[in-house]
Amino acid sequence: ISSSKPNLTVSNESHDISKLSPTKTSTVSIDAELVAQVGGSQIALYDKSGDAFYDLISAFHKSVRGSDPDAALYWYARILQGGGDALYVGRRLLAIASEDIGNADPRAMQLAVNAWDTFHRVGPSEGERAIAQATVYMALAPKSNAVYQAFNKAKIVAEQTSTLDVPDHLKNATSDITQALGHGDTYRYAHDETNAFAGGENYFPQALAQAKGYDTNFYKPTERGLEKQLKDKLQYLNQLNRESNDQRY
């Protein structure tokens, strides 16, 4: 910084400003270390839109995913220290709840929503702590990305088979014409079936259900948390489908 007014000259060897001459035009070299010494505090390594911001968020997310509540709280505090928005962290927790925890502990999603709501109701001081509470819970919750992976697979297959028509038994008969076409005629109402499950029914387009090369078993539950029970339930339903004498196709 150049100036025609009396100025400070700072060298790498000394930051003693009392020895600087006030009579000469000088160049001041200011770095984070100097400002920290003069101001008596450190400068947080953070900016709200650059790499440092995304690195901190990444460290936070990976700490929660890695089940380390202490590290997650540390990076959360670093984000706040640098002037970051606690609600951004709250949004990230909502993403973590579905991406990294999923059905292993569905309560994680509700806790993230509750933390978000608490922040808006009571303000930053108490709200930041609510987000910290959700952070700790999610870090220690059982982990599963089975839903995340299943949805990605479903989107790929849906894109590749987007021209397939909805099967007639799944269509809604909304007019005399659609009724005449037989829409919904052979639909099996699950509540009227044993255990409210229509064994052997198929809810995919016939061409997709019978096509080779497509794995439509998108959701593969883990053995962790509540998802273990969902896995057992899914295996039971699949068995009923295989053993049914009333196969759709």
Where are the model-predicted features located?
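Conserved C-terminal helix/linker of AAA+ ATPases
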Residues: 2-42, 87-93, 150-155, 166-169
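Conserved C-terminal "switch" segment of AAA+ ATPases
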Residues: 2-10, 22-28, 45-50, 100-107, ...
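Short linear motifs in intrinsically disordered/low-complexity regions
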Residues: 8, 13-17, 32, 203, ...
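Extended, compositionally biased low-complexity polar/Lys-Gly-rich tracts
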Residues: 23-46, 214-230
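Conserved helicase/translocase motor-coupling segment
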Residues: 33-36, 40-78, 91
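Terminal-proximal interaction/regulatory segments of ATP-powered molecular machines
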Residues: 66-191, 195-197, 210-211, 217-249
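Accessory helical-bundle/CTD segments and flexible terminal tails appended to RecA-like ATPase motors
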Residues: 198-200, 204
